[in-house]
Regions:
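Non-catalytic pre-domain segments flanking phosphatase-related domains
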Residues: 1-19, 156
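Glycine-rich phosphate-binding "P-loop"
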Residues: 16-26, 68
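Short, acidic loop-to-helix structural element flanking the phosphoryl-transfer center
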Residues: 6, 28-46, 79-80
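Catalytic beta/alpha-barrel core
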Residues: 28, 50-51, 70-75
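C-terminal cap/substrate-recognition subdomain and adjoining C-terminal extension
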Residues: 59-156
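Catalytic phosphate/metal-binding cores of nucleic-acid and nucleotide-processing enzymes, i.e., regions
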Residues: 12, 41, 69
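Substrate-recognition element of Asp-dependent hydrolases with the DxDx(T/V) motif
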Residues: 24-25, 38-63
């Protein structure tokens, strides 16, 4: 668990981390450099779930290699499926990280939604549905590894 107190907002407790796969932690079906090391550190602190529509068919393989849980969403209303996952975990203790339009509801439902703008870009709708926006996944994960950075960003 990660606990932080943000001046002007209050105390937050993060127990779950939901990560979108393609475009967020993977590019062209490959995990981005630096991600495995950071997830290794975070696995000691939070429950990590990799959520994917499995566009490239490698979700299970990549999740296994990272030793995280996999949650596959079916074609259709992917936003609603991701939202349901966050609600099941408990939005009040879940951090979500994503870059696509189908991540919007999960970002809004989570206590902390982090928008990653990567080489794949980020949808306009997704960019306006965040608490924090960062240039890449490693910066996003570092915010959880070093939560004092979040305090500086989110304080009121």
């Amino acid at each position: 668990m990660i606990e932080i107190t943000i001046p002007g907002i209050g105390q937050h407790r993060f127990e779950h981390l939901v990560l979108d796969l393609n475009g967020t932690i993977a590019l062209d079906g490959n995990i981005m450099e630096g991600v495995p090391v950071r997830l290794e550190l975070l696995r000691e602190l939070v429950d990590i779930v990799l959520v994917t529509a499995d566009t490239r068919g490698r979700g299970q393989e990549l999740g296994n290699s990272l030793r995280v849980k996999i949650h596959k969403v079916d074609p259709g209303d992917e936003q609603a499926q991701k939202l349901k996952l966050v609600r099941q975990l408990g939005g009040g203790t879940t951090v979500s990280i994503g870059n696509g339009s189908n991540d919007v509801y999960m970002l809004k439902e989570s206590i902390l939604g982090i928008r990653v703008v990567s080489a794949e870009g980020a949808s306009y709708e997704a960019v306006t549905s965040w608490d924090v926006i960062v240039p890449d996944i490693n910066v996003a994960l570092d915010l959880l590894i070093k939560p004092e950075r979040l305090i500086a960003t989110l304080r009121k």
